[in-house]
Swiss-Prot record:
Record-given protein name: Photosystem II reaction center protein X
Subcellular location: Plastid, Chloroplast thylakoid membrane
Organism: Emiliania huxleyi
GO cellular component: chloroplast thylakoid membrane; photosystem II
Membrane-spanning segments: 12-32
Length: 39
């Protein structure tokens, strides 16, 4: 694996961690605290 490819993969993983984790945590938090039943 070339250094540029490994750097690209690490940046993609970092972006996923920075973006997806807070959004999923917020969705789980809202879904657990929101008591409105949706059909």
């Amino acid at each position: 694996m070339t250094p540029s490819l490994s750097a690209f993969l690490s940046s993609v993983i970092l972006a996923v961690v920075v973006i997806v984790v807070p959004i999923s945590a917020a969705l789980v938090f809202v879904s657990t605290t929101d008591k409105i039943v949706r059909s």
